[in-house]
Curated annotation (Swiss-Prot):
Domain P-type, residue spans: 31-74
Protein name: Trefoil factor 3
UniProt xrefs under SMART domains: PD (SM00018)
Gene Ontology terms: biological process: regulation of glucose metabolic process
Signal peptide: 1-22
Native organism: Mus musculus
Annotated gene: Tff3
PROSITE patterns according to UniProt: P_TREFOIL_1, P_TREFOIL_2
Record carries keyword Disulfide bond: yes
Pfam families assigned to the protein according to its UniProt record, in alphabetical order: Trefoil
Tissue distribution: Expressed in goblet cells of the intestines and colon (at protein level). Expressed abundantly in goblet cells of intestine and colon, and at low levels in stomach. No expression in brain, lung, spleen, kidney, uterus, pancreas, liver, heart or thymus.
Gene Ontology CC, one term: secretory granule
Amino acid sequence: METRALWLMLLVVLVAGSSGIAADYVGLSPSQCMVPANVRVDCGYPSVTSEQCNNRGCCFDSSIPNVPWCFKPLQETECTF
């Protein structure tokens, strides 16, 4: 019984700890989300949350009014010589 309680506590801690991670960009580098406001391509819908937006693989920035807050990231390109 004690072992079961320990596993349950561990599971609760892991789930609670992972909820803060959702606010980070999922699989995106910070530079990919440095999209100028005038060229943002909408990736969300009205009232989309940052978590929902990031889970779609998009960037979220609500600091600039009247532009898409949930937008497609820049594509990283490889240098070819």
